[in-house]
């Protein structure tokens, strides 16, 4: 039996509020994270992802509080990322009620962190978040044509995005959260070529993110190899509902969780 496709709203949280911009800039307030999380749970979201975009020390304590409050009200799996640098950070988030933790920049600086986390907490708890973009003109060429970026897509990490996903799998992560920085907030559809290339390179689940603008954008991402589809602003501002996305996915011949 095919595994049901997961539909995941993503909430970027800054100082205890949900924010959304294009390519992480021009952030607009999109509401209270716990209220939004409860709404998405009621609307049929399969999971939720919180990304802490404040990632300062003050922001950290606030984020743990948001996770605690959310876990009290919401009973679907919760992934939390942003500023995760150590096993201690992961331990705190899991104790607060997160089910999974996504790791990004800190793993680029120290890849063995992924192995440490996977061995200590289990692969199912560790998500590698890859902020990928097409190599810009004049950039360092990469075999796949896609590079890993840091700092909200503004800096190149100088490594190939597809090879980095493969390395993450080899180091024991359970999923890849693949975010197209070219697509982030643009609503022009997912980067299907990026999804295909990563899908062919890894056997663990791939969550596609970046570019969703309408319900019809989701089935092509699944056809390209995504096991789960993630979006943010179209859900927060009420442009698209989770049930509309699921209807499109079912109409295209895929299974969803009812």
Swiss-Prot record:
| Catalytic class of the enzyme | lyase
Q: Which Gene3D superfamilies match?
A: Aldolase class I (3.20.20.70)
Q: Which residues form the active site?
A: 12, 131
Checking CDD domains in the record gives: HisF
Record carries keyword Ubl conjugation:
no
**GO function term, MF aspect, one:** lyase activity
Biological process GO annotation list? Answer: L-histidine biosynthetic process
Q: How does it assemble?
A: Heterodimer of HisH and HisF.
Give the UniProt family note: Belongs to the HisA/HisF family.
Query: What name appears for this protein in its UniProt entry?
Result: Imidazole glycerol phosphate synthase subunit HisF
Origin organism of this chain?
Corynebacterium diphtheriae (strain ATCC 700971 / NCTC 13129 / Biotype gravis)
